[in-house]
Swiss-Prot record:
Residues 248-257 have a biased composition (Polar residues). The keyword Ribonucleoprotein does not apply. It comes from Oryza sativa subsp. japonica (Rice). Residues 164-241 have a biased composition (Acidic residues). PANTHER family: ACIDIC LEUCINE-RICH NUCLEAR PHOSPHOPROTEIN 32 (PTHR11375), ACIDIC LEUCINE-RICH NUCLEAR PHOSPHOPROTEIN 32-RELATED PROTEIN 2 (PTHR11375:SF18). Keywords: Leucine-rich repeat, Repeat. Residues 163-272 are annotated as: Disordered. Residues 139-184 form the LRRCT domain. This is Acidic leucine-rich nuclear phosphoprotein 32-related protein 2. LRR repeats lie at residues 57-78, 79-100, 106-127. InterPro entries: AN32 (IPR045081), Leu-rich_rpt (IPR001611), LRR_dom_sf (IPR032675). Belongs to the ANP32 family.
Amino acid sequence: MADAAAPGEDDAAWERAIAAAVKNAPFSAPKTLTLDGAVKSTTGRLPSPSLLGRYPSLEELSVAGARLSSLAGLPRLPALRRLSLPDNRLSGAASLAAVAESCGATLRHLDLGNNRFADVAELAPLAPHGVESLDLYQCPVTKAKGYRDKVFALIPSLKFLDGMDAEGNDCLDSDDEEDEEEDEGEEGEGEGDEEEEEEGGEEGEGDEDDEEEGDEEEDEEEGEEEAEDEEDEAGADEEDESKVANGSKGSSGSAQPNKRKRDSEDDANGDN
């Protein structure tokens, strides 16, 4: 009876864990579901397909440390790109066949670290699909002779195995790449702001120089105008003085002939 009740008990625990995980999701149809350590399965299985099947929009699913020994019943997840199942008890081709059937067409990242896969042949169900990154760290298979070469040969789409490419170069996790791109974008924005501030400062200095030059030019023009006004006033004064002088001479010259005329007339009258 206890064995018969175990699956139901597991499902109840899984349902509570899933409800808690999606409670704070920003969308009604979450794209990421993390159940790491949320349930310690008594049956070694995932929850009933109907529980995970409620979220067909999932792109990332993580179920680490749940004591899973089988992936039977993994529902169809047509959008899943990343599946993380480390620290479980998984082994055998059957588990990976369930993965291939559930999300083989879209899956790109598969983490099976610290499980019980012991032979490269167990990975065969992944061969026809597009997995690009596979982690098998701390699995017995990693100790097999020629392990890396054999896995790369088995899965043509594979780019990274246990964090390294076929040449042994470290890969950069996609999350790290996104963080670096954001940092570069922020640095670019910061440099752009500094350049704008410098340009603004140069423009401000240029405006100040222009204003100073304009003020100097205005002062020079005002000085020239004042000088011209003084010259005009001096010229006018000279003209006035000249007119006055000329007028005085004209008056004395004209008076002498009149006096002579009167004297002549007086002489003539006396003779008569």
